[in-house]
């Protein structure tokens, strides 16, 4: 599993959709931008989560479309520092439990929906 560490919490790569951009294109682009991983094969939709956050004196509602993705080529991970991502890591299923104690509820929901 490909995880990122942002603001001290483990997370999954994600981001904002550009105007008119297909959700699948957004998913692949954001993973590439946040981790340096390219040439991914998109799998099926896992789930859609919603969460609210407060920024610039405004509450925002964010809908996130989560997809399975596969990769075939080894790649050096490059965390996107300008997005406050301090680490990107491949994590085996057996290594997930301690990391998932330090994440967001929506990420736990994604792993639950993915049957991990």
Residue map of PLM features:
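N-terminal strand-loop-strand
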Residues: 1-13
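Proteins with a high burden of low-complexity, intrinsically disordered sequence enriched in S/T/G/P/A and R
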Residues: 9, 55-61, 112-116
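Unchanged
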Residues: 17-44, 48-103
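Charged phosphate-binding loop/patch that engages nucleotide di/tri-phosphates or the phosphate backbone
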Residues: 98-116
